[in-house]
Amino acid sequence: MREWIGDLFSGEPDNVPELLEMLQDAAERQLIEVDALNMIFGALHVSDMHARDIMIPRSALVVVQEDQQPADFLPTVIESRHSRFPVTGDDLDDIKGILHAKDLLPLVLQESGARFSMKDSIRPAAVVPESKRLNVLLEEFRTNRNHMALVVDEYGQTSGVVTIEDVLEQIVGEIEDE
């Protein structure tokens, strides 16, 4: 009984729900900012989420085809305002790699049409299962210095893509790009 009474007044949480309750109380008493509280909640929540929960689905992907000429794909790249693009072969399940928009700058800056080789420009695509937990994925992004991963289902078919920005937005909220 003495231990129970001591625990009652110790002020230390014994589990995550108690911790969240204490943090909520601290925010209500203005000891921490609401934005900080939301980030803490987000950071704790990412370990419960999976790549499938936040990925850009297959149907919404903006891709470049391996055999396309720059004149054919540049308008799409510019209009989309994305910085990375999956490069496909025959279909969306045949991902050859990732094309970075910054690697296309010489094509945009030179009206004469700089020499471009898709094969030399694409980078290997990181591949993750739909079930990958976001906290693990974030660590892999950091460790491998990747910003985008191809998400595949249990049959190895493309489900979508997920970016480091998608994961970070789960922690800090919406990130507005210019």
Model-derived regions: residue spans:
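Soluble cytosolic regulatory domains appended to membrane proteins
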Residues: 11-178
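Short, low-complexity N-terminal regulatory "tails/caps" that precede and couple sensory modules
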Residues: 1-13
